[in-house]
UniProtKB/Swiss-Prot annotation:
Gene that encodes it: cheB
Domains (record comment): Contains a C-terminal catalytic domain, and an N-terminal region which modulates catalytic activity.
Alphabetical GO biological process terms: chemotaxis
Organism encoding this protein: Roseobacter denitrificans (strain ATCC 33942 / OCh 114) (Erythrobacter sp. (strain OCh 114))
Homology family: Belongs to the CheB family.
Single annotated GO MF: protein-glutamate methylesterase activity
Name this polypeptide is given: Protein-glutamate methylesterase/protein-glutamine glutaminase
CDD domains: CheB_Rec, REC_CheB-like
Length: 375
């Protein structure tokens, strides 16, 4: 007897969702949105952290949606306690204020799977589908198997002292590191970037998240790392020790090689593109200089970056993919691995060292092949 996909899905138990938000309006809105997806079932609501704690103790849930800003115990504090006592998938709800963006990035670093923006202009069908998919995918994951707190902030003077040697130095050999990440990427990047050479090849990253979040994330990384972390600027030469994040400005970020080294440039968004900025767009822009490039694709939902990594690998780049065990969502790296684009599949705690060694190996090769003038 024939059965279609929807009929098959109806036999799969729905993922149980607990909504935690002090706003009754937001709780009602979110319940309505999630009710449109048969894969999800809202099993409870809580207006504050205490109610949420009591509910979790007595009732099973596969995923929690958690407001960041609540009276009493904040969502961020509750998340921190939850991850210590009973780790489970959490999707944060945040406003687009500066305070909300900073807290959202902290939440993603502390173990939240994803962060959804609260609506500002009414109900939207595409937004509804996106929220349902992200909550469902979060419910299918487990908290990343990373040690929380590894990326603690360094003393304020440590990064400045280490930056002095790299400041203003162009990357003459042309080496470049490219990284793409999505869901789970904040904690993954905080595991990778500290292990890179602080005076080494520049790094350009596409991390899927709203623009305000990217600004907060770049500032957070800049406080944590000896590297110089900032959002990409068009036409500015990339220097040794730079870590550049593609901004969320409605345009894609590409890299281009000039006489004085690598630069970033912005290109118009393709309406057909699912993500902006796009990992694929970044990766494809470096194919002509692939032999100078090391590239990594980290945890994330979907397939953005897989085709671009394949083209880079075919053109001579060194490629790395995060393994399934340490990925929050084994989507982007899975597709890239399936295409044969990933040359080295590694747990997240080994990718930073592998990227660093790949650039050191490139530098040694360059020195061996450089002709030395006769004396």
């Amino acid at each position: 007897m024939h059965s279609d996909t929807n009929e098959h899905q109806s036999h799969v138990p729905a993922k149980k969702v607990l909504i935690v938000d002090d706003s009754r309006v937001i709780r009602m809105w979110l319940r309505t949105v999630l009710a449109s997806d048969r894969r999800l079932e809202v099993v409870g609501e809580a207006s504050d952290a205490v109610e949420a704690r009591d509910y979790i103790r007595a009732n099973p849930a596969d995923v929690i949606t958690l407001d960041i800003e609540m009276p009493g115990m904040s969502g961020l504090e509750f998340l921190t306690r939850l991850m210590r006592a009973r780790p489970m998938p959490v999707v944060m709800l945040s406003s687009l204020t500066s305070k909300g963006s900073d807290a959202a990035v902290q939440a993603l670093s502390r173990g939240a799977i994803d962060c959804i923006l609260k609506p500002t202009d009414g109900y939207d069908l595409d937004l509804s589908r996106d929220i349902c998919e992200r909550v469902y995918q979060a419910a299918c994951t487990r908290p990343a198997s990373l040690k929380r707190g590894e990326a603690t902030e360094k003393p304020a003077d440590a990064p400045m002292m280490q930056r002095a040697s790299a400041l203003g130095q162009p990357c003459r050999r042309g080496s470049l590191i490219l990284i793409g990440a999505s869901t789970g990427g904040v904690s993954a990047l905080e595991a990778v970037l500290p292990k890179l050479d602080p005076d080494g090849a520049p790094v350009v990253i596409v991390q899927h998240m709203p623009g305000n979040f990217l600004e907060s994330f770049s500032q957070r990384l800049d406080r944590q790392l000896p590297q110089n972390v900032k959002l990409a600027e068009e036409g500015v030469p990339l220097r040794r020790g730079d870590v550049i994040l593609a901004p969320g400005i409605g345009k894609h970020t590409e890299v281009v090689r000039r006489m004085d080294g690598w630069q970033c440039r912005f290109v118009a968004n393709d309406p057909a593109a699912l993500h902006c900025p796009s990992v694929d767009t970044l990766f494809l822009s470096a194919v002509s200089e692939a032999k100078k490039v090391s590239v990594a694709i980290l945890t994330g939902l979907g397939k953005d970056g897989a085709q671009g990594m394949l083209k880079l690998a075919e053109a001579g780049a060194t490629t790395f993919g995060q393994d399934e065990e340490t990925s929050v969502v084994y989507g982007m790296p899975r597709v890239a691995f399936g295409l044969g684009a990933v040359q080295h599949q590694l747990p997240i705690h080994k990718i930073g060292e592998a990227l660093r060694e790949s650039k050191n190996a490139s530098a040694r090769t360059a020195r061996r092949t450089t002709k030395v003038p006769l004396q």
